[in-house]
Amino acid sequence: VNKIIFKKNDLIYSILLMPFLSKKNQINLLKKSYKSLKSGGGFICINKIQSSNSQFQDIFNQLYFDFKKSKKISSNDILKKAQSLRSVMTLNTQAEEIKNLKKVGFKKIEVFFKYLNFIGIIAVK
């Protein structure tokens, strides 16, 4: 993250990247993104998140498992992937995602998509 150089931009998007960064690097990337946006520029991110409620988390996980099964992915393959990702992903809650955007300076923030454990957020500088 520290090696990434941004030019001035009207729009930056991050698709399923943040969960693969440490909390510190998530904030660093958000800071760099915010600083490189022109006034009125937008930041769009789509991330996998952790539910703030364990019961909902279990329901969402099961529904996502069922979705993958409907796509003819074997139970074994689904479990292997889930296990391999568990050790490399740092998931935030929806509230943490919004708090991080506010922390780096964004004031206009809106959730535009939410499905199970996935969220889309747009923030404007």
What would you call each of these model-derived segments?
Residues 2-3, 18-19, 50:
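Active-site micro-motifs of SAM-dependent methyltransferase domains
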Residues 98-125:
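Core SAM-dependent methyltransferase catalytic element
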Residues 2-12:
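A short acidic, Gly/Pro-enriched loop at the edge of an enzyme's catalytic core
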Residues 10-25:
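A short SAM/SAH-binding and catalytic strip from SAM-dependent methyltransferases
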Residues 40-48:
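Conserved beta-strand signature within the Rossmann-like core of class I S-adenosyl-L-methionine
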Residues 48-104:
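C-terminal alpha-helical "lid/dimerization" subdomain adjacent to the S-adenosyl-L-methionine
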